[in-house]
Amino acid sequence: RDLARKHANFYIIDAAKLAVQVGLGEKRTNNILQAAFFALTKVIPLDMAVEDMKKNNYNSYFKKAGQKIVDLNDKAVDLGISAAVKVEIPASWADAPDTPMAEPKNASAFVRDIVLPMDRQQGDKLPVSVFQKHGVLDGTWENGTSAFSKRGVATKVPKWNAESCIQCNRCAMCCPHAAIRPVLLAEEEKAQVPASFETVPAKGLGKDAPSYFFRMQVSPYDCLGCGVCLTACPANQSDKTADALVMTPFEEMKSEQANFDEVAMNDKYLKKDVINSKTVKNMQFAKPYFQFSAACAGCAETTYIKLLSQMVGDRMYAGNAAGCSSAISGGAPILPYCKDSQGRGPAWEHSLFEDNAEFAYGFFHAQDAIRKELLIRLESMKDAGIAPAEIEDYINNWNDGEKSRAVSDALIAALEKCEQTEDVSYILENREYLSKKSIWAIGGDGWAYDIGFGGIDHVMAQN
């Protein structure tokens, strides 16, 4: 409608197809698009633009890649000049009505009222009252909203070949966007999932593991097509076997989204009895609490953050430095940090200033002070005979990150049944601090080695 009303000249170009035709590969579209831009806009004489682009190709590629690559990029420039196709805009588009957009499943009121309008570039139309209604005037934000931004931007996504897969889960570990995940199903669960969710017997889970069925499931609409999973796959690097992952056109794979949403994203299918942090394989059966970020295709930073979230995500506090990691972690409205079915997940914060090491260290000291106060009160309550067994168990494990969650839950359940004295009420009001948190300062090399190095040096010197 806007195109018609503004009488815009509208052009399209299949740059990925042309890049393949040239021989550069579908992702090397820069010269094609740049040449098309200069041909259409004429911001400088086209001959001058072509000459400068080809000169830049030589300077950029000759020394490190040779004349062949220079020639391919020059050919891309020549193709791009005439590749744009004009689309005639019907006059009827000027009066095109708004089409109601289907709301995603499981979208909360916050997502419907705030996130989706912002994702449609309509955030400026939101009144202050809608933020007040949802209690986010202080800047807090519902997490997990990236799950509702199904962009579907990859031209090709990986297709799993069960016969060649060795079930090492390296592809899942290396995926920057948590868009490919291993799933285990018990025999009785196979009847609960779609018929298209084909599995094979799981292997290599450990000698005491139950018998499960395995599938590697991709999310076509969340995949960015970077190909990191293919590079990480041992079967793909072997000449002895067929590839376990094959890049396949998006149109052929988009039906797989239902399998991902209904099974791979469903916490009830998580198999906690095989999850451990001792092996790459078994760790990938854990839920990623960092998923579908807006990071660039193939981003390495998000791979580390995602893996960290799988290890300690349900009790993780993160202070984030300024940089790429803060932009992709806290760029409203799409937040990749999420919570599980029990409402647990990472708590994330970003300091306005370049003091992230000190900022996260403050998290640690605050947690330490609050939890020690709780411990003093609990010891007094134990002496008074209030829930002595549960308090004893908690005191013995309060500083163990893995065990403190379970003993904290048991303690809370016991205290809720007790007489609500001042101490009991205080403990229950501060229950979120009972379990030990895993506190992290996250940032890139600009923060760690340059502007924030003094803070890191200070924090490490305190230990």
Stretches found by the model and what they are:
Residues 1-27, 184-205, 236, 241-246, ...:
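Glycine-rich, acidic loop regions that bind phosphate or pyrophosphate groups
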Residues 1-120, 190, 194:
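Active-site cofactor/cluster-binding pocket
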Residues 9, 157, 172-179, 215, ...:
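Beta-sheet entry/capping signal
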Residues 19-20, 166-167, 181-182, 188-190, ...:
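Flexible loop/turn segments at secondary-structure boundaries
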Residues 100, 144-167, 184-225, 245-253, ...:
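Ferredoxin-like iron-sulfur electron-transfer modules
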Residues 114-181, 186-191:
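Segments forming glycine/polar-rich beta-alpha architectures that bind adenosine-containing cofactors
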Residues 144-146, 170-192, 219, 228-252, ...:
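Iron-sulfur cluster-binding cysteine motifs and their immediate structural context
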Residues 257-463:
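Cofactor-binding active-site loop characterized by glycine-rich and histidine/acidic residues
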